[in-house]
Amino acid sequence: MMMARKQDVRIPTYNISVVGLSGTEKEKGQCGIGKSCLCNRFVRPSADEFHLDHTSVLSTSDFGGRVVNNDHFLYWGEVSRSLEDCVECKMHIVEQTEFIDDQTFQPHRSTALQPYIKRAAATKLASAEKLMYFCTDQLGLEQDFEQKQMPDGKLLVDGFLLGIDVSRGMNRNFDDQLKFVSNLYNQLAKTKKPIVIVLTKCDEGVERYIRDAHTFALSKKNLQVVETSARSNVNVDLAFSTLVQLIDKSRGKTKIIPYFEALKQQSQQIATAKDKYEWLVSRIVKSHNENWLSVSRKMQASPEYQDYVYLEGTQKAKKLFLQHIHRLKHEHIERRRKLYLAALPLAFEALIPNLDEVDHLSCIKAKKLLETKPEFLKWFVVLEETPWDETSHIDNMENERIPFDLMDTVPAEQLYETHLEKLRNERKRAEMRRAFKENLETSPFITPGKPWEEARSFIMNEDFYQWLEESVYMDIYGKHQKQIIDRAKEEFQELLLEYSELFYELELDAKPSKEKMGVIQDVLGEEQRFKALQKLQAERDALILKHIHFVYHPTKETCPSCPACVDAKIEHLISSRFIRPSDRNQKNSLSDPNIDRINLVILGKDGLARELANEIRALCTNDDKYVIDGKMYELSLRPIEGNVRLPVNSFQTPTFQPHGCLCLYNSKESLSYVVESIEKSRESTLGRRDNHLVHLPLTLILVNKRGDTSGETLHSLIQQGQQIASKLQCVFLDPASAGIGYGRNINEKQISQVLKGLLDSKRNLNLVSSTASIKDLADVDLRIVMCLMCGDPFSADDILSPVLQSQTCKSSHCGSSNSVLLELPIGVHKKRIELSVLSYHSSFSIRKSRLVHGYIVFYSAKRKASLAMLRAFLCEVQDIIPIQLVALTDGAIDVLDNDLSREQLTEGEEIAQEIDGRFTSIPCSQPQHKLELFHPFFKDVVEKKNIIEATHMYDNVAEACSTTEEVFNSPRAGSPLCNSNLQDSEEDVEPPSYHLFREDATLPSLSKDHSKFSMELEGNDGLSFIMSNFESKLNNKVPPPVKPKPPVHFEITKDLSYLDQGHREGQRKSMSSSPWMPQDGFDPSDYAEPMDAVVKPRNEEENIYSVPHDSTQGKIITIRNINKAQSNGSGNGSDSEMDTSSLERGRKVSAVSKPVLYRTRCTRLGRFASYRTSFSVGSDDELGPIRKKEEDQASQGYKGDNAVIPYETDEDPRRRNILRSLRRNTKKPKPKPRPSITKATWESNYFGVPLTTVVTPEKPIPIFIERCIEYIEATGLSTEGIYRVSGNKSEMESLQRQFDQDHNLDLAEKDFTVNTVAGAMKSFFSELPDPLVPYSMQIDLVEAHKINDREQKLHALKEVLKKFPKENHEVFKYVISHLNRVSHNNKVNLMTSENLSICFWPTLMRPDFSSMDALTATRSYQTIIELFIQQCPFFFYNRPISEPPGAAPGSPSAMAPTVPFLTSTPATSQPSPPQSPPPTPQSPMQPLLSSQLQAEHTL
C-alpha cells in the first residue's frame, strides 16, 4: 500500500518567469543584465553547455523561427531538482525579454503589442509549437539541436525572479535600472505571485549597487534577495529554490547564503576537482610526447576527469593537460642537461687532463682544442640544428654524448674553469703529498708503531694543513707506517733466524713457558732490530710465537719464506725434471686407487649441495672423470645437507677421505649452516690422529643462479661471505657472472680453479705419493741429505742443475718429490745414492729418526741467519756422520769487500776443521759447479757407512725399548708436528693392527736384510763390541707396541718370538716408511689406546712405563726412574749427555767409544747450550711452582713412593731390572678421592655415589647409562674410534652437570657429540666408589682364565659371573651387551672386541698394582673383558659358545712362534701382540707361558 501511495504522488511542477531590465541599447545599455546566463546556468549547469553570449538583436527570420516563434520570451526547458528537503520537483523556466530587429534596431512586432513591463507581468503564456532555447547558434539551425516543445504550447506562471544587474554596465545608469525595476515590481505585485530579487553578475558587482539593491528590497515587504553569479555558478540554484519555497508554502524556508560565502564553497569545490584531475593527468601522462586526443579518451570514464570538465569545461581541462606536457618536456630537457653537465668534467679529464696544455686557454680556445682530440667524438656530438634542447636530440636516449653546442652555455664555461682549478689544486696537493712523504722518510722521529698523535708535531706545518685534510696525511702516514713496520718485521724475522740455535736449544713446544719467553727477550733485547718494534710489543711477541710454532711445527706453510720455501722450489724442479715417471712408478700409480682421485665434499643446505653435485657431474665424462690441464682425474663427490654429527652426513667415512670441501650458501641461514657444520666437523676430530679435517682446504661460494650481481641483499651476502672466509681462512669465490648460462650455480672455470687448488693441497700433503717398499730402500747404497736455507740469495736451480742434468740422475723409487737417485763411481765400485734435497727445517726431524749416511749443508756467506741455521742443525748430528759444508758467495771481489762474507767464510771453514768435515765455497756468479766437487765427501761416507748403519740400528731398537714419551718432547728428536712437504703416516687412515706386522709378504725381505746386515758386521772386527752391545740390548728390552711397559729379562731360548718382533719393529721403524719422512702427530701405535689415557710428556724424570694404578682411584700413574739425568734434553735421545742410561746402566765401554754429537766437538756449536740445562721441557701449565719442589726431592736422594732404590751389583740382573721398574714403598699409599670432572664446580648427588643408590629393583640400570647407550646406539655406532677418542672435558662436565639437575635430559636436543657422551659414560663408572667388577670377583676371574681348555674356561667364567652382586650383574650385562653391538660394526667404527676391551678394562676393573701378580695379570684382565664381549650371548643369554673370528686350525694365529733371532729363515707365524710385558720368572704365570699363548690364539 505504501509503495502504491508513493507511486501515486505526483512530482510538483512550477513555472517560473525570469524578468528584468530589457529593451533597446538605450534602455539597457550595451549588454543585458544577465537573465539568459542565469537561465542557462540553472537549466544546463555543465561548463561546456554554458554560453556567455545570448544576443537579443535578431533578424526577422530568426525572430519568426520556431525557437523565438514571434514571441518576446524564451522557453528554456524543463528542470528537475531535489530541494533541501530531498523532495524532487520540476520547473519550467521562461525568460521575458525584448528582441530587437537587426535592421531597424527597434523591438520586433509581435502578436502582443504591450510594453515590456506589462508583458513581463503576464501569468498566462501561450505559443504553439515553441521550441526549447539553447543558445544563439541554435537560431536558424534548429534541426542540429534537441527539439523539445513548450508543454501544450502554454504556461501559467507561478512566480517571478526579478533580476538586477549590480555590475558596472556600459552606457547604463544604475539608478535608472532601479526605477525600471521598481515599476516592474509594482506591476508584478499586482499578480499576487511570489517574487524574488536576484542580483546578477555579483562576480563583477559594485558594492554601492548591491547595497542600494538591498535597500530597495527592504523597502518592500517580505522581498528576499539572492546574490548570484551565473559565470561562477554561485547561488544560481539557490535563487530558484528560494522562489519555489515561496510558491509552495508547505516547504521549509531556504537559507539564503551570502555571495562571498557561496563563492568560497564553489571555489573549494573547483580546486578539489582540479587537484584530482591534475593527479589523474600526472598518473596517466608520463611522456612529453603524448597528445590530448588519446589521453582524453583514456580519461573519459574517470570521475576526476568528469567532475572537472563539469565544473570548468573541456577547454580548461585541455589547458591543464598542455601545461603538464610542457612541464614534462622541461623536466626532461633539464635532466638531459644535468647529465651532460655531469659528464662534461669527465670529458675534460679524459681529453685535456694535462694542466700544461690548457693552463692559459680560454673556453673558446679550449673548445677548438677539444675538436682536435682523437677521442672527441666519443664524448661529444655535433648537431646540425641548434640549440640542442629544441631538436629531436632530446629524445635520442641511446646517444649519451654531449651536444657540442652546450659548450657555448655559461654552465659549461663555469665547469671548464672548475676543471682548470681542479688541475691546479691537484698539482699542488701532489706536491704537498710528495713533500710530506719526504718528511716522513727523512725524519728520525718516525719509528715503527709510533702513533699519529705523537708524530704529527714533528712533521706537520701550516702549508700541509692548507692544502690537504688531516685524514689524507693520516692515510699517507698509515701507509708509511705499514712499510716501515713490514720492513722492521722482516728484519726482526731475520734476527730470529740468526738466533736459531737459541730456539732449538730451548726445546720449545707449542706453548712455551714464561721463563723461556723471558730468556728469548733477554738474549735479543740489546739487538737494534728487537728495539725497533718496541712500540709494537704485542706484534713482536706474536712474531716470536709464530717463529716458535715454525720451530716446533716446521712446514712449507709456516716457513718464514713462504711461498718461496726451498721445499716447494725443490719439488717443482724435481717434478719438472722427471715428467715421465719410471715403469715402477707407473705400476704403483695404477695400483694406487687414490693417485688420480679427488674426493670432494659439497656442503650446503636446502638442496644446494645436491644441485651443485649434479651440475659438476654433468661436466664430467660418463665414468665421473674430470679433465684438468689435459690430465684426467677421477672425481668423487659427497654432497652433505644435514647435521654433520650424524654418521650419514659425516665428512669422512672408511671409504671416503676428503681432499677438500665446497661450502655453498645463498642466504644468511645457509651461511650459518656452513659455519656451524665446519665448526662441528673440526670439533669432532680434535684429539684424533686423523684430525686433518681441521686443515681441510675449504672454498666458500655464494650461489647466484641468475647471475644477478646487483641489489643490497646480494652485496650484504658477499660481505658476510668474505668475513666468514677470512675467519675460516678459506678461499671465497664471487658469484658467477651473468654470462655463464641459464640455471648454473657455478661455472666450469670456477670448478677447475677449485680442483686445481685441491690438487696442490693434496700434493703438499703427499696424499698421492706412494710409500717406498723395503726392496726399494734396500737397493740404495747411500742416503745423503742436502740441506738448503730458505730465503738465501741464491737460486736452488743453480745448485741442483749439476745433479738433475747428470746422466746418472734418476727419479726416486719411493715416489718422494724431494729425492733423486744417483749412480756414481766411488772408489772402484758404482754406488747408488739417494739424494734428498730439503730445507733445514725439514731436515731437523730426520737427524735421529731416519738413516742418513751424510749431510751436504749449504749456507750463504753474506747472510748470518743462513750460517746460524747450519750451526743449529749440526748441534744434534752424531759425530760419525760425514758433513760437507758449502759456502755460497758472490765472487772473490765481494768476499774481499764484504767483512761479513769474510767472517762467515772463515767461521764455516773453522767449523769444518773442528768436526773433521769438508768445506768448499762456490761463487753464485759461477754458472754451475760440478758434481765431482763432492766425490771426496762421498768417499768419506762410504768409509763410515757400516758404523753409521750399526749405530742407527742400535739407537732405533733402544728407542723402541724405552719410553715413548722421550720421542715427543723435543723438536730435534722428531717433532711430533713436523711434516713439512713429506708424506703423512698412512696409519691414520686405516686402523693399525695389534700385531707387529700386517702384511706377511714383507717378512722375507726383512729377514734377508737381517742376514745381510749380520754378514757385514761379522766381517768388521772393529764393530765387535757394538754388535755384542746391540745384542745385549735386544736381550734386555722388548719394544712396546701399545704403550710403555716395564723392561723384563728373559732367555732367548724361551722367547725368541718376542725378540724377533722387537728387532723387526726397529727395522720397520727405520725402513718401512718413506725415507726422510718426519713423524706424524702424537700417534700411539695401538689404535685402541684411549686418547685420554695417553701419557703426556713429563719433565725432569724419565717415565719407565704407565699403567692404571690404585683400584680406589682409577687413575693413570707413572712409575719413573729418577736416576736418569734430568738435564739431558729429555727427548733428543742423546746418550752422550747422560751420566747413566736405562739401556746401558752398569756397562762400561771397552773397545769403541759411543758416538757423540757435533756440539761436543766444536766450540762454535751450541753457544746457547747453557740454556738447554736450565729448563725442563714443558709449557706454563707443566712448569708451575711444583718444579722447585720436584727438583728438591730429586736432589735429596731416593725418596718418595715412586723412587727406585739402587741395588748391589752382584744381584741377579733380571731381578734387579724388574725391581728397579716396579719397586714401591712398602707403605701402602693412602687412598685419595678420584679427581672427577664433575666434582670440580659442584657437589653431585648422582655421580661418584655407590651403584646401589642410583638403581632400583624396577629400574636396575642407571638412567644416565641407559640414556648414554641409547644415544650412542642411535647416532654413534658408525663413529670411527668410538670409546677410543675422548670427548671434550668441558662438554663432559656440562653434560653431567645438566643431567644432575634434570634426569629427563634429552641428549639429542643438546647436540652433544658422540665422543662426549661416550666419555661421560666411562666417567660414570670411573667415579663409582667400587669398580663395576668387584675386587673379590677379579681374583676368581683371573683363576678361571688360567684354565687351558677353552670351553671349561668359558663355563668357569660364567660361574664367577653368577656370583656378582645383583646390581653389578645387571649393569655389567647391559654394558657388555652394548659393547657387543658396537663390535659388530667394527668394519665401520674400527673398534673390535679386542679394541673395546683395551679401552674398557681399566674402567670396569681398576685393579690394584701393589703386587707383582696384579701387575702381570693386566693382559689377563683385558682378555677377560674381551671374552665377555665376544661371548656375550653365551654369558648372558644362554646361547651356545660362538667360534672366534680368524681361529681356524692351521691359521697363523693358531701356531706357536718358532722364528729364530737374526736368521734368514722366513717368518711364517704372527704371534699374539704383547699388550703387556711377558711374565717374569717370579710370576706364577711363567710355567704357563707357552700354553697360554697357544690358548689365547685359540680364543
Swiss-Prot record:
Domain pG2 pseudoGTPase, residue spans = 783-947
Domain pG1 pseudoGTPase per the UniProt entry, residue ranges: 592-767
Top-level taxon in the UniProt lineage: Eukaryota
Per the record, its GO cellular-component terms are: actin cytoskeleton; ciliary basal body; cytoplasm; cytosol; nucleus; plasma membrane
Please name the GO terms of the biological process aspect recorded for this protein, alphabetically: axon guidance; axonal fasciculation; camera-type eye development; cell migration; central nervous system neuron axonogenesis; establishment or maintenance of actin cytoskeleton polarity; forebrain development; mammary gland development
Q: Which SUPFAM superfamilies match?
A: FF domain (SSF81698), GTPase activation domain, GAP (SSF48350), P-loop containing nucleoside triphosphate hydrolases (SSF52540)
Which keywords, in A-to-Z order, does the entry hold? Answer: Cell membrane, Cell projection, Cytoplasm, Cytoskeleton, DNA-binding, GTP-binding, GTPase activation, Lipid-binding, Membrane, Nucleotide-binding, Nucleus, Phosphoprotein, Repeat, Repressor, Transcription, Transcription regulation
A Gene Ontology molecular function term for this protein is:
GTPase activity
In its record, the post-translational modification comment is:
Phosphorylation of Tyr-1105 by PTK6 promotes the association with RASA1, inactivating RHOA while activating RAS. Phosphorylation at Tyr-308 by PDGFRA inhibits binding to GTF2I. Phosphorylated by PRKCA at Ser-1221 and Thr-1226, induces relocalization from the cytoplasm to regions of plasma membrane ruffling and prevents the binding and substrate specificity regulation by phospholipids. In brain, phosphorylated by FYN and SRC. During focal adhesion formation, phosphorylated by MAPK1 and MAPK3 at the C-terminal region, probably at Ser-1451, Ser-1476, Thr-1480 and Ser-1483.
Q: Please give the residue ranges the record annotates as the region Disordered.
A: 1124-1148, 1177-1207, 1446-1499
Q: Which residues carry this modification: Phosphotyrosine?
A: Y308, Y1087, Y1105
Keyword check for Nucleus, yes or no.
yes
Binding site residues for GTP: 28, 33-37, 52, 56, 95-97, 201-203, 229-231
For the FF domain, which residue ranges apply? 270-327, 368-422, 429-483, 485-550
> Would the keyword Nucleus turn up in this protein's UniProt record?
yes
Residue ranges for the region (Required for phospholipid binding and regulation of the substrate preference) are 1213-1236
Q: PROSITE patterns recorded for this chain?
A: FF, PG1, PG2, RHOGAP
Where Phosphothreonine occurs, the residues are: T1226, T1480
Pro residues bias locations: 1471-1484
Domain comment?
A: N-terminal part (1-266) has GTPase activity. Required for proper cellular localization. The pG1 pseudoGTPase domain does not bind GTP.
Task: Please give the name of this protein.
Answer: Rho GTPase-activating protein 35
Species for this entry: Rattus norvegicus (Rat)
Which gene does this sequence derive from? Answer: Arhgap35
